[in-house]
Swiss-Prot record:
This is Isoleucine--tRNA ligase. Binds 1 zinc ion per subunit. It comes from the Bacteria. The gene is ileS. One of its GO terms (biological process) is isoleucyl-tRNA aminoacylation. Monomer. Belongs to the class-I aminoacyl-tRNA synthetase family. IleS type 1 subfamily. A motif ('HIGH' region) lies at residues 58-68.
């Protein structure tokens, strides 16, 4: 028996079937480095329009987790797709370097005995070490960027730039010193930003406390009574007994009704709506003898339960009726609403009682409780209230309460002297900051769109921004305050520039070692040099100033404004937020044009990632087992607008999808063996109809993908590429062309037409996947035929695709109908294989009973219909002639019948044909194969 294998154009490529990504990816990284890929991109992009994605800096502490990987991969996919779309898209990675976590790490490692200077020195060393580790991990993910020159908030230039940004805000009148309640952590010994606060359940002791009336006549008049018949008190309810020693007022709602309730021994003032529940809680009987509008009780004085001072009634809209008594006890030093209300009633800072120190211990001079830690003092306070007859009720509840995100310990509001950026303070020119920021939000694009309402709500309701911290490792607030007046030096902005110049040379240490006389001369004795440092959110929030127009000037045609900020949804209250405020304060616009928010990673059951649950996914482990491209494919396949599920099983599914895409690429490459585009590429008009359709379909898909990429809809990109590989290519086109590719003459029009289409598809596909499968795309690029540059990323979207001309007889709609018919035939062929009627599809002969229009369409292909259906014979018969055993299909106007061929099998093309053996020199093959071997070769027109 003759072996005809050598006469076939069998596929051949060195592109490996097995990806081996964990081993191959590091080699590709080395190649990118050796060719200077990032620098080459900057060179070829210098005259292109710019697209700047500004990197939100991760904190320089610890190994990267799956959230970091997700974030950096999303950014890289955008930068790569923008590059392919013709933009110069630089990517400068950054790191957030100052702040408490690093200072805390240094203290834990080296002890708390360190001097401030030594602490800063060790913090700088630690941050640098952490950055190197994280940098290696980010590069391993395939993230293209300026890794040799990243920005770091601890770089001297950036520290100096931050001081200059603060000076701009001082100059415009946004910065002030004030006493205000701020989120305070006893363990940090510092104020916390809103973004550093998290909520967790806490058990608290609630108390109902009676404050005896001090002005009985005024209270009686408020209730429309001539006098009070017995002692009276107003009752408050609180979950913070420790604040009672700092009570200075009582807040009620002006529009609620309040009742005077006779309980026998005394009269109680309670919100009318809550009388019944309160009396039940106190185990008392009582009756309402009078009611009054809350506004009538304004400025009625009551007495503190155990201190000799008054507590006046103030009106406040924030009082609620959900729980308690409808009366809120006010300790202005320890509650933001209380503080605002007391200030509205004329209380000055010196009047506000602040008995709790920075470590949570009452000052020694506080009567009864001096020297006690506030949480431990609660029982003593309750006991004192009981002793004086003021305690109405106490119980323990569990409720959501603010905690430090680092120490996981409860926080308090604590009024301290701090530096603030005023939200509603009138600047020297223009609108207040809140107004500016809200306008800027309207001018910003949000992806997803709901982010706009979320950020708007946060800005609309936020308090002034406390920007000062009492720590060592941070950018200093370089102010000099007059010792007598407490006022800033009149030349503050000028002095800040002098400090910035020193910091540019020596880092933040320059301020801390500075002798005031060096800048102030003879005035030095009149001023205090302050040692507060800036909130780390000010560090990262001003990168648009000290990075984009400073250390890494972007040279954007429209100024130092990023096109895109991209971070997790928590950054609406973090980096997006602080950047918006500083941008609007300095430049009167947001520092970004568009904000993209991604969700958090969860496991496949929707649970948060947690080491205790054992459901964390470590990027390093994925890189070393499956490869970074699998992680990148998972990111692209997942809708980032909500929670993003990831697990070993989910990543395995991504690996399966990857194999399908890789196998498609390998098929394309292997069938381009011997193809030289410079020599063999056919013009569109010389190609077969099916091949022209395949190129046209590729062009249409490319247009869709470009749009999805521009809208950052990567899951649509992934699904469409995957479906194209599996369905339109694998399930239709590539199956059909195998016969023509393998059996026709090596240099025949039929084969070169097919290879031309495969070449165009390959050139397009390798670019489509480049933003997602960064390593694999560049690997494929090395195996494509024809002259090419060193990396797929040095190119744009493929421009060699052609559209089917209008009026083409076998147009898109035609091939859609053919695909539907082929799907129906495939279904019946599978049934016949299952029933053992046929062994393989080529053993089948199919008769199509079609209505007139469909019959005419299918008949256009003539004998080539069998190649489309991949059967040994196919005939089209009028629908009316369908026998009873013809199978109905889902295609309207189509029935079909499959029978097993009775002919011999061709030993070369494997078709079962009547003419097998008709040529005496080749008794084992069909006449078509004989013609392809020794004759002029078969001619194909369509498929």
């Amino acid at each position: 028996m003759t072996d005809y294998k050598a006469t076939l154009n069998l596929p051949d490529t060195a592109f490996p079937m097995k990806a081996g990504l964990p081993q191959r990816e590091p080699q590709i990284l080395q190649r990118w480095d050796s060719i200077g890929l990032y620098q080459k991109l900057r060179e070829i992009g210098k005259d292109r329009p710019k697209f700047v994605l500004h990197d939100g800096p991760p904190y320089a502490n610890g190994k990267i987790h799956i959230g970091h990987a997700l974030n950096k991969i999303l950014k890289d996919m955008i930068v790569r797709s923008k590059t392919l779309s013709g933009f110069d898209a630089p990517y400068v990675p950054g790191w957030d370097c100052h702040g408490l976590p690093i200072e805390h790490k240094v203290e834990v490692t080296h002890g708390k005995h360190l001097t401030a200077d030594r602490t800063r020195e060790l913090c700088r060393e630690y941050a640098a070490e952490q950055i190197e580790g994280q940098k290696t991990e980010f590069i391993r993910l395939g993230v293209l960027g300026d890794w040799d020159n990243p920005y770091k908030t601890m770089n001297f230039a950036n520290e100096a730039g931050e001081i200059r940004a603060l000076a701009e805000m001082v100059k415009q009148g946004f910065v002030f010193k004030g006493l205000k309640p701020v989120n305070w952590c006893f363990d940090c010994g510092s104020a916390l930003a809103e973004a550093e606060v998290e909520y967790a359940d806490k058990k608290s002791q609630t108390i109902d406390v009676a404050f005896p009336v001090a002005d009985a006549d005024k209270l009686a008049a408020a209730f429309g009574l001539p006098a009070l018949a017995k002692p009276a008190a107003i009752v408050i309810w609180t979950t913070t007994p420790w604040t009672i020693p700092a009570n200075q007022a009582l807040n009620i709602h002006p529009e609620f009704k309040y009742a005077l309730v006779d309980t026998g021994e005394r009269l109680l003032v309670l919100a009318e709506e809550l009388v019944e529940s309160c009396l039940k809680r106190y185990n008392l009987e009582g009756s309402v003898i009078a009611t009054a509008q809350g506004s009538a009780l304004e400025l009625v004085n009551f007495r503190h339960p155990f201190y000799d001072r008054l507590s006046p009634v103030y009106l406040a809209d924030y009082v609620e009726l959900g729980a308690g008594t409808g009366v809120v006890h006010s300790a202005p030093a320890y509650g933001e609403d209380d503080f605002v209300t007391c200030k509205r009633y004329g209380m000055v800072n010196d009047d506000i009682l602040t008995p709790v120190q920075s470590n949570g211990v009452y000052v020694e001079s506080l009567e009864f409780f001096g020297g006690q830690f506030i949480w431990k003092a609660n029982p003593a306070i309750v006991e004192k209230l009981s002793e004086v007859g003021a305690l109405m009720h106490t119980e323990t509840i569990s409720h959501s309460y603010m905690h430090c995100w680092r120490h996981k310990t409860p926080l308090i509001y604590r009024a301290t002297a701090q530096w603030f950026v005023g939200m509603d303070k009138q600047p020297s020119t223009g609108e207040p900051l809140r107004e500016r920021a809200l306008k800027a939000i309207e001018d910003t694009q949000f992806v997803p769109a709901w982010g706009q309402a979320r950020l708007h709500s946060m800005i609309a309701n936020r308090p002034d921004w406390c920007i000062s911290r009492q720590r060592n490792w941070g950018v200093p607030i370089p102010f000099f305050l007059h010792k007598q007046t407490g006022e800033l030096h009149p030349r503050t902005v000028e002095l800040m520039e002098a400090v910035a110049k020193r910091v540019e040379q020596e880092g933040i240490e320059a301020w801390f070692k500075l002798d005031a006389a060096e800048l102030l001369g003879d005035e030095a004795g009149q001023y205090d040099k302050i040692t507060d440092t800036l909130d780390v959110w000010f560090d990262s929030g001003t990168t648009h100033w000290h990075v984009l127009r400073g250390s890494h000037d972007i040279g954007h045609a429209t100024g130092p404004r990023a096109d895109l900020y991209l971070e997790g949804s928590d950054q609406h209250r973090g980096w997006f937020h602080s950047s918006l405020l500083t941008g609007c304060a300095i430049d009167n616009h947001a520092p970004y044009r568009e904000l993209l928010t991604h969700g958090f990673t969860v496991d496949e059951s929707g649970r948060k990632m947690s080491k205790s649950l054992g459901n964390t996914i470590e990027p390093e482990k994925v890189n070393n087992t499956l490869g970074a491209d699998i992680l990148r494919l998972w990111v692209s396949a997942t809708d980032y607008s909500g929670e993003m599920a990831v697990s070993e099983q989910i990543l395995q599914r991504s690996a399966d999808a990857y194999r399908r895409i890789r196998n498609t690429a390998r098929f394309l490459l292997s069938n381009l063996s011997g193809f030289d585009p410079a020599r063999d590429l056919l013009a569109p008009e010389d190609m077969l109809a099916l091949d022209r359709w395949a190129v046209d379909r590729t062009l249409l898909l490319q247009r869709e993908l470009e749009e999805h990429y521009s809208e950052y809809r990567f899951w649509n990109v992934y699904s469409k590429i995957h479906n194209f590989c599996v369905q339109e290519l694998g399930g239709f086109y590539l199956d059909i062309i195998k016969d023509r590719q393998y059996t026709t003459g090596a240099n025949s029009v039929a084969r070169r037409s097919c290879q031309t289409a495969l070449y165009h598809i390959s050139e397009a596909l390798v670019r489509w996947i480049a933003p997602i499968l960064a390593f694999t795309a560049d690997e494929i690029w090395q195996y494509l035929p024809g002259e090419r540059n060193e990396s797929v990323m040095l190119n744009g979207w493929y421009q060699g695709l052609s559209e089917l001309p209008e009026g083409t007889e076998l147009d898109r709609a035609y091939w859609d109908r053919v695909m539907a018919v082929k799907a129906a035939v495939n279904k019946e062929l599978e049934n016949q294989r299952t029933a053992k009627v046929i062994g393989g599809n080529l053993q089948a002969e199919v008769t199509l009973f079609a209505e007139e229009g469909l019959s005419a369409d299918l008949s256009k292909l003539g004998d080539e219909l069998r190649f489309v259906l991949i059967t040994s014979a196919a005939s089209v018969v009028p629908f009316a002639q369908a026998p009873a055993d013809a199978v109905a299909t889902e295609v309207e106007g189509l029935k079909l019948k499959v029978v097993k061929s009775g002919h011999a099998k061709c030993g070369r093309c494997w078709h079962f044909r009547a003419d097998v053996g008709s040529h005496p020199e080749h008794p084992e093959i069909c006449s078509r194969c004989v013609d392809n071997l020794s004759g002029s070769g078969e001619v194909r027109h369509y498929a």
